[in-house]
Amino acid sequence: MRRIAVVGAAGRMGKTLIEAVQQAPGAGLTAAIDRPDSTLVGADAGELAALGRIGVPLSGDLAKVADEFDVLIDFTHPSVTLKNLAFCRKAGKAMIIGTTGFSAEEKQRLVEAGKDIPIVFAANFSIGVNLCLKLLDTAARVLGDEVDIEITEAHHRHKVDAPSGTALRMGEVVASALGRDLEKVAVYGREGQTGARDRQTIGFATIRAGDVVGDHTVLFAADGERVEITHKASSRMTFAKGAVRAAMWLDGKAPGLYDMQDVLGLH
């Protein structure tokens, strides 16, 4: 059995991950971790996820459950994830990282850790989104410089980073296919007298409202026609199942920083 730990286990995504782990053949939740000051520490992780008792108590200390798992799934916050990364690197534990909002310097720390442990890091673990990334690469190469490109994303009111990591990853894929540097061509929102649009730019628009799980659309607009590639998530379970699939795939893999495209064989 693949022994899996979930950090942030008392949160919305954490509970969904617990359910996904318990549903996956060959996988089992053997540790669940949350903030040390959480009033839920000691509670049964299965009961927190409305699955019934599974005999795995919620821990407030990752080090105390280090011997209980093979791979850690982390969908939390960059500051938390980086602390967990340092621990897993020292302990020789594999990691699945779905946290977004990392700076360029912080992403480099993931690269460095990948020299010692196997890691799957992805902005989005949905199979559909990763298929969209493949389609975006093809669309950008075919349509080339003859289109204006805009990326729109929508998420629930609680999401703290913008644009989403998925939107930025979509922008990176498109920019790379066109031989552009996203940092130089990205335009984040527009206001006032902006002047005529520069076709080399890639625009981003962000919506935060209600309980939207995650919508992403990339628009390729030419004179006379438009192509839109859209993905809409209706449940966090799609991300959780992808993360568990990645955790199973990582079993026996050599140290390295992998992404979901590797897991799905899309490279």
From Swiss-Prot:
Enzyme category, top tier: oxidoreductase
Positions annotated to bind NAD(+): 8-13, 34, 98-100, 122-125
Residues annotated as the enzyme's active site: 155, 159
Gene3D superfamilies, A to Z: Dihydrodipicolinate Reductase, domain 2, NAD(P)-binding Rossmann-like Domain
Pathway entry: Amino-acid biosynthesis; L-lysine biosynthesis via DAP pathway; (S)-tetrahydrodipicolinate from L-aspartate: step 4/4
EC assignment: 1.17.1.8
Binding site for (S)-2,3,4,5-tetrahydrodipicolinate: 156, 165-166
Pfam families, per database record: DapB_C, DapB_N
InterPro entries from the UniProt entry: DapB_C, DapB_N, DapB_N_CS, DHDPR_bac, NAD(P)-bd_dom_sf
GO biological-process terms attached to the record: diaminopimelate biosynthetic process; lysine biosynthetic process via diaminopimelate
Catalytic activity as recorded in UniProt: (S)-2,3,4,5-tetrahydrodipicolinate + NAD(+) + H2O = (2S,4S)-4-hydroxy-2,3,4,5-tetrahydrodipicolinate + NADH + H(+); (S)-2,3,4,5-tetrahydrodipicolinate + NADP(+) + H2O = (2S,4S)-4-hydroxy-2,3,4,5-tetrahydrodipicolinate + NADPH + H(+)
Function: Catalyzes the conversion of 4-hydroxy-tetrahydrodipicolinate (HTPA) to tetrahydrodipicolinate.
Record's protein name: 4-hydroxy-tetrahydrodipicolinate reductase
The species this protein was found in: Pseudomonas amygdali pv. tabaci (Pseudomonas syringae pv. tabaci)
